[in-house]
């Protein structure tokens, strides 16, 4: 069984974290040798940057600062966690990666998406996901889920208005057009269990 780099993407409230937890369990049951990680974060240094980028109280952060901080954290994550796992023959399951920067900072902050892409390609070099699962849910549905989930950790980006989240969603649509072979769109209005079953079936195909 080969090792591949898998990422989960989607707007806030898409159920991505819940699906990631279920997928972790099902991949273990399937006997897949893998690690699960996340962004921003995924390594000790990168987790420190995560706290800065997502921290409540940092609302005055300049958009370009946000891009560069996340790209720096991503570089450290790639070097310290992702590449070593792949080199050891382990599949990597990552909650968010560079596509989140293109959607949230590029599209969401009205920045040049091509420039954001180039910054991230500089950071990750050839460590590009083999397969990306996009959990597709309308922005208003996602925000309603966040509001209803009282136990969820609220971060700085959750406090953005509906217009920002719609821009993020439009950004994802552009990214899917840029990398159609890498993306698989999954209807995130389905239950987490249904979504997990769909994704796991495709992962098993990718690994054979």
UniProtKB/Swiss-Prot annotation:
Coiled-coil-forming residues are: none
Catalytic activity from the UniProt record: dTMP + ATP = dTDP + ADP
Q: Which one of the record's GO molecular function terms can you name?
A: dTMP kinase activity
Provide the protein name: Thymidylate kinase
Record's keyword terms, sorted: ATP-binding, Kinase, Nucleotide biosynthesis, Nucleotide-binding, Transferase
Taxonomic source organism:
Listeria innocua serovar 6a (strain ATCC BAA-680 / CLIP 11262)
Lineage summary: Bacteria, Bacillati, Bacillota, Bacilli, Bacillales
Q: Which GO terms describe its cellular component?
A: cytosol
For the keyword Transmembrane helix, the answer is no
């Amino acid at each position: 069984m080969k090792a591949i780099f898998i990422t989960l993407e989607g707007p806030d409230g898409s159920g991505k974290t819940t699906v990631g937890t279920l997928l972790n369990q099902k991949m273990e049951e399937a006997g897949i040798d893998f690690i699960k990680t996340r962004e921003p974060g995924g390594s000790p240094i990168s987790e420190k940057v995560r706290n800065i980028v997502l921290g409540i109280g940092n609302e005055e952060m300049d958009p370009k600062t946000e891009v560069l901080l996340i790209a720096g954290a991503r570089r450290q994550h790639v070097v310290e966690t992702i590449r070593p796992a792949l080199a050891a023959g382990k599949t990597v399951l990552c909650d968010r990666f560079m596509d989140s920067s293109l959607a949230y900072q590029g599209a969401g902050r009205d920045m040049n998406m091509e420039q954001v892409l180039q910054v991230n390609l500089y950071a990750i070099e050839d460590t590009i996901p083999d397969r990306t699962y996009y959990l597709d849910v309308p922005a208003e549905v996602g925000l309603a889920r966040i509001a209803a989930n009282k136990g969820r950790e609220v971060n700085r980006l959750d406090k953005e208005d509906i217009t920002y989240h719609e821009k993020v969603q439009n950004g994802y649509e552009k990214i899917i057009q840029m990398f159609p072979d890498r993306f698989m769109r999954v209807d995130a209005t389905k239950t987490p269990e249904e979504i997990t079953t769909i994704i796991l079936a495709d992962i098993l195909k990718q690994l054979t």
